Amino acid sequence: MQERHKNRKKYFNELAETCRKYFLPYIERWHIVEPATNVLEIGCGEGGNLLPFSELGCNVVGVDIASCRIKEAKSFFEDNGATGQFIAEDIFKLRDMERKFDIIICHDVFEHIDDKRHFLLNIKKYLSDNGIVFMSFPAWQMPFGGHQQICRSRVLSHLPFVHLLPCGLYKLLINAFGEDTGCMNELISIRNTRITIERFEMLSRFAELKINDRMLWLVNPHYEVKFGLKPYKMPQSLAHFPYIRDFFSTSCFYILSK
């Protein structure tokens, strides 16, 4: 398990840095970001992605079903002298927020969603008429698409592609490295809710969401602050090959609209 998974303030600061340097400029190519822009993050965690938007004067709202993360978000924003609204709830129960947001952020959340079709059908209800969704997720087949980096075992947390083993063999491996029940359940849950580039684009079309842009990364921008690795976009010559590209896409950026 990496230090950032235990030190949530460190994780908050790292997310804010990555957002400021990479997510925000990408979003600004598709929607103006200015004071009073309404920004929602679904699955906001500690709120690191929202800090750069708050610093620009945007009205930011973070929603997460984990109340402990919302508590941390409020605390970290207060520490930074930033303003934001944070709510511990299922976003789709907050009907008073429909048709309100200019920008919706969904970063590294979609791969955890069980009913993805329902999620995409409903997320657009929260967009303003000219609003956009910034969606990012790791392709399932990429080396660490199973989130094995959360494991306490230093060996297992650094083993690429092990999540692609047959489920029974994968469970045996997790047990062999002494991971606890909580870790096992989380890893198998991620396996069950996995997402590929091809399935995401199919579901987006089904939900009548327009894909305005796609950017696939060989080296995830967040790896810069995490590991000191320079981000590297996937060449278009590889990005056009269905299924093969999934094995190399450490992060997939999308801009969606109604």
Predicted regions and their residues:
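A structural alpha-helix within SAM-dependent methyltransferase catalytic domains
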Residues: 51-54, 120-124
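S-adenosyl-L-methionine-dependent methyltransferase catalytic module, highlighting the catalytic core
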Residues: 117-122, 132-257
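Helix-to-beta-strand junctions that scaffold the AdoMet/dcAdoMet cofactor pocket
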Residues: 113-114, 127-128
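Short glycine-/acidic-enriched loop or helix-start segments at secondary-structure transitions
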Residues: 51, 72, 115-116, 144-146
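Short catalytic micro-motifs in class I SAM-dependent methyltransferases
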Residues: 108-112
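Surface-exposed loop/turn positions
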Residues: 37, 130-131
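Conserved strand-to-helix beginnings and helix N-cap segments that scaffold or border functional pockets
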Residues: 98, 116-117
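Conserved N-terminal segment of class I S-adenosyl-L-methionine
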Residues: 1-99, 103, 107, 247-254
